[in-house]
Amino acid sequence: MTLIEQIITIGICIVAVQFTRLLPFFVFPVNRPIPQYIRYLGKVLPPAMFGMLVVYCYKNIEILTGYHGIPDLLAGIVVLGLHFWKKNMFLSIAVGTLFYMALVQLIFI
């Protein structure tokens, strides 16, 4: 790609990102209530995404080889414990990820 094409591509990306960030403010203005189905989606999608992350993380574990998925299961237990204790999805995922990385980098080498 030439320099001009790269600049145009970056410009298009910037416009697309800003459009998607500003779109909700135009679709759901402050003076109108948010539709009930949008509130419903805001309530059910975070746990659904959490469930999809769990399935994605555990799909390739091979119980009969290597470490038998022990680091994965321990990290999952940490995530569940933190989530039930603190009720903070970001904290649960971040600490679970750090715990898993520490296990596979330092203990299960």
Swiss-Prot record:
Whether Ribonucleoprotein counts among this entry's keywords is no
Query: What is the membrane topology listed in the Swiss-Prot or TrEMBL record?
Result: Multi-pass membrane protein
S-S bonds: none
Location (main, coarse): membrane
TM regions (residue ranges):
7-27, 37-57, 63-83
- From the Swiss-Prot or TrEMBL record, state where the protein is found: Cell membrane
**InterPro entries in the cross-refs:** Brnchd-chn_aa_trnsp_AzlD (IPR008407)
Supply the Pfam families for this chain.
AzlD
List GO terms (cellular component aspect). Answer: plasma membrane
Q: Which UniProt keywords apply?
A: Cell membrane, Membrane, Transmembrane, Transmembrane helix
User: Which protein family is it in?
Assistant: Belongs to the AzlD/HI_1737/HP1330 family.
Q: What is the protein name given in its UniProt record? A: Uncharacterized protein HI_1737
Tell me what organism the protein belongs to: Haemophilus influenzae (strain ATCC 51907 / DSM 11121 / KW20 / Rd)
Q: Highest lineage ranks of the organism?
A: Bacteria, Pseudomonadati, Pseudomonadota, Gammaproteobacteria, Pasteurellales
